[in-house]
């Protein structure tokens, strides 16, 4: 089995993948901790022959995690943000400072669609752009839905946005304080994603396929004007591209990859942008 770890600052996700069949056998999520408990926080390591890690947690968390795993697993691979990988050149002035989860999303997206805009809807909403030739432009970071709400210090009125709500409902004026806050936060997030996407595509002269991942991808998706696809395993797919271990991975078949979404006509993107600038 392959154990894939996506370690965040507060929440970490894992999955077990069968080497022979490439099937995902199990998956889960736990709070990030200094000391993992195999068999409790993560699967029993007796069945694991290799580990792949993407981590944006503190350096001490990654160091201690790797030390624990290497005592029991033969191969432990840690992803790093690099100046270039798999045909993509990093747009950051200091590539090592780009969050490795974002880099994994960029690499996975590029393998799937060529140029793309990858959006991770987590605690923060990050947007990264890579052109068809492999040049990563850099990206944007804005507060996610939860962080925006926490900044308002609502206390007991801090009711989460219902992920099953329809976009028309979430974009309508709120009829009480909780709705007004939730709808305002949602409007802010989706408006930012729509506007940033249009601005960058207009400036670069190319409309890019749009890929979403992260815990809030499904609800953010409902408010986007651009054709797109949701790819929950996009960070894991980045690990697969960097450290291919199964026959399917070596053949370029990435876990859970959606059909590549069509890019909208550039003229339509520009028309939408021009209209929004008149408002």
From Swiss-Prot:
Entries under Gene3D superfamilies matching the protein: 3.30.420.40
GO molecular function: ATP binding; metal ion binding; pantothenate kinase activity
Subcellular location: Cytoplasm
Residues the record marks as active site: 101 (proton acceptor)
Pfam family, one: Pan_kinase
Associated pathway: Cofactor biosynthesis; coenzyme A biosynthesis; CoA from (R)-pantothenate: step 1/5
EC category name: transferase
EC number: 2.7.1.33
Reaction(s) this enzyme catalyzes, per UniProt: (R)-pantothenate + ATP = (R)-4'-phosphopantothenate + ADP + H(+)
Alphabetized InterPro entries for the sequence: ATPase_NBD, Type_III_PanK
GO biological process: coenzyme A biosynthetic process
Binding site for substrate: 92, 99-102, 177
Required cofactor(s): NH4(+); K(+)
Binding residues for ATP: 6-13, 123
Alphabetic keyword roster: ATP-binding, Coenzyme A biosynthesis, Cytoplasm, Kinase, Metal-binding, Nucleotide-binding, Potassium, Transferase
Residues annotated to bind K(+): 120
Statement: the UniProt record of this protein carries the keyword Cytoplasm: yes
Cofactor comment: A monovalent cation. Ammonium or potassium.
Keyword flag Phosphoprotein: no
Family: Belongs to the type III pantothenate kinase family.
Oligomeric form and interacting partners: Homodimer.
Protein function: Catalyzes the phosphorylation of pantothenate (Pan), the first step in CoA biosynthesis.
Protein name: Type III pantothenate kinase
Species this protein is from: Chromohalobacter salexigens (strain ATCC BAA-138 / DSM 3043 / CIP 106854 / NCIMB 13768 / 1H11)
Taxonomic lineage of the native organism: Bacteria, Pseudomonadati, Pseudomonadota, Gammaproteobacteria, Oceanospirillales
Gene name as annotated: coaX
